A protein has these predicted regions:
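Conserved beta-strand positions in repeat-built beta-propeller and related beta-rich domains
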Residues: 93-98, 136-143, 178-182, 223-227, ...
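Surface loop/turn motifs at the tips and blade-to-blade linkers of beta-strand repeat domains
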Residues: 73-78, 118-122, 158-163, 200-206, ...
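Short coil/turn segments that connect the beta-strands within blades of beta-propeller domains
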Residues: 89-90, 133-134, 173-174, 218-219, ...
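Bacterial signal peptide processing site
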Residues: 44-46
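Short loop/turn segments that connect beta-strands within beta-propeller blades
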Residues: 108-112, 150-154, 190-193, 235-239, ...
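Beta-strand-rich domains and repeat architectures in extracellular enzymes and scaffolds
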Residues: 71-103, 119-130
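Signature of short aromatic-glycine-proline-rich micro-motifs recurring in repeat-based ectodomains
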Residues: 82, 211, 258-265
Length: 302
């Protein structure tokens, strides 16, 4: 309405001016007015292109940092270069590595006594271990070969093959989950060993390399980061690290001078809700409880 009123008043002014000059420039003014009206009308009638809706980016939730409390200290054979650890019905099953020293063991927790043992050939370097449907699955490092054992006897049942290196191994109850030292985790069919899917693990958008021993706990994947005192908790759906678990101070003093004798070995007792960790050639195995990180130094072994 305001725009129409503006055009009408200016038209009247122009006609009045032309009357005083004898309508000398009437035709020119009419042309100019027509152009003006046409341009303004075009501005009014031309639909505006809708603006794209701006959706603010949702920041990735920050991973929480956890520390630990030691609830119990158990004996552990310091000759075992721990590569995989499982607890089932009160018994530990452990994969010990190194060429010429690799084995699968059945261990009584309180005493640390090895109840049964199955040795690997000297050309195999044992790695991750998991129990699924009454069978123990054990990886080897660079040999692309795994072994299946009866859990009660540790008698070998069969072998299987995979395309990557073998580092850590766990299960979500149906598939095997394998790490190969990179930031990629592989879900394998336990029958065919075909890759069902794979997930890249990241922390704040950056890849997390050297994923080693694995444990699946109540829908979350836990992984040792090789050569560190850190365990990461991973969302298996997208590979995002949701917690950093700082186990600084847990490594025994006698293992500090040896670069390779690091934290490695996670076992969760789902029947009793107990979490155990150990390391390569460590003299102890620890039951721990995860707690929010405190600025103070984490609890150290007594």
């Amino acid at each position: 309405m305001l725009l129409k009123k503006f055009i009408f008043l200016n038209w009247a002014t122009i006609i009045s001016m032309d009357k005083k000059t004898g309508f000398k420039h009437t035709s020119l003014w009419i042309i100019l007015i027509a152009i003006l009206i046409g341009g303004l009308t075009s501005c009014i009638l031309e639909p505006k292109e809708p603006q794209a809706e701006v959706i603010p980016a949702v920041p990735e939730p920050l991973a929480q940092t956890l520390s630990y409390e030691i609830l119990n200290t158990l004996p552990h054979d310091p000759t075992c270069y721990t590569q995989g650890l499982v607890i089932h019905e009160g018994i530990f099953y452990e994969s010990c590595g190194l060429y010429g020293q690799s084995s699968l063991r059945k261990v009584e927790p309180t005493s640390g006594i090895v109840q049964a043992e199955s040795d690997l050939s000297a050309n195999y370097f044992a790695e991750g271990l998991v129990l699924l449907d009454g069978k123990l699955y054990q990886l080897t490092w660079q040999e692309n070969t795994g072994f299946v054992y009866g859990a009660s006897t540790l008698e070998p049942i069969s072998t299987f093959h995979y395309q990557t290196q073998g580092w850590g191994l766990t299960t979500d109850g149906s598939a095997l989950i394998l790490s190969d030292g990179s930031n990629t985790l592989y879900w394998l069919d336990p029958g065919s060993m075909q890759v069902l899917r794979q997930v890249n693990v990241s922390y704040e958008g950056q890849p997390v390399e050297y994923l080693n021993e694995l444990e699946y706990i109540n829908g979350t994947l836990f992984a040792n980061i090789y050569l560190t005192d850190t365990i990461v908790a991973i969302d298996p759906k997208d590979g995002r690290v949701i917690s950093l678990i700082d186990l600084t101070g847990l490594r025994p003093e006698q293992n500090l001078t040896m670069q390779g004798e690091v934290l490695n070995g996670i076992a969760y007792d789902d029947q009793n809700d107990k979490l155990y960790v150990t390391g390569k050639n460590w003299p102890n195995l620890y039951e721990i409880r995860l707690v929010p990180q405190n600025p103070a130094t984490p609890t150290t072994p007594q």
